[in-house]
Amino acid sequence: MESISLPWTLPEPLQQVHLAHFSNLDPATQSAAIIDRIISASRLPSASPEQAQQADEERVKLDFAFLDPTKLCSKLHLLSAVTQAAVVCARSWDDDRQVFREGEASIGGMKSKTPHSEVIYMLNPGNNVGESLKRFGLSPTSSSLLLVKFSSPTADKQAILQSMIDLVSPSNLTSPPTAEAHTPIDIDHAIRYGSYPTTPSTTAQVTDWKQLNKIYKLQIPSTLLNNKQDNQWYEKYQDIICTSVAMKLVAA
């Protein structure tokens, strides 16, 4: 897991973000099961105080952004969306009640229900939250998963990582072969290659270029984007996509 500090001027619950990559998932028994659990949590009854408490506890366990990392071209692509989401959510933060107010897009606030769903929404060029989830969220056919978690700067990182592992599986956590418990990890390698290859210069990215071209209305062939001898096309592509994400707030 990689933890990144965000500006202290943001509300405390947004001052840190944690990213964990999971690979080699079985779509049928893992990806689909996680999606079913998310859907079930949204439908839990809350008529009684006991039911409401149980529903809240289950939703806390699922309080992440669930992304298909093959729809990302790099960590910078993701962090562009994280930053934009944090800015928008800061506008919807109720400091007195210590909650985020949803549905404030018309006044520059949150479009979706949580900061984590706002990250997924920010990745999508369009303004439809459901479309954003379909394009960038975990799907029943996903074989990898990227979890994103906002927290305060004092949150227990190990506890956050453990909650992520409990949700997926320790055997699926993507980490360098020689990484120790407290070794800093650059999640960019996992996003781009699906693992931590010993020779990334000769390893092709796992990014779904065809889908990204379709989503962002680009027509750059994957052969150019995977050219390790000359990565200028990849760098231009990344710049275009990150600019598109950053411009969403301006265009809204």
Curated annotation (Swiss-Prot):
Source taxonomy: Eukaryota, Fungi, Dikarya, Basidiomycota, Ustilaginomycotina
Name of the gene: CGI121
Coiled-coil stretches noted in the UniProt entry, renumbered to this chain: none
GO cellular component terms attached to this protein's record: chromosome, telomeric region; cytosol; EKC/KEOPS complex; nucleus
Keywords annotated in UniProt: Activator, Chromosome, Nucleus, Telomere, Transcription, Transcription regulation, tRNA processing
Protein name: EKC/KEOPS complex subunit CGI121
Pfam families named in the record: CGI-121
SUPFAM superfamilies documented for this protein: PF0523-like (SSF143870)
Quaternary state and interactors: Component of the EKC/KEOPS complex composed of at least BUD32, CGI121, GON7, KAE1 and PCC1; the whole complex dimerizes.
Organism of origin: Mycosarcoma maydis
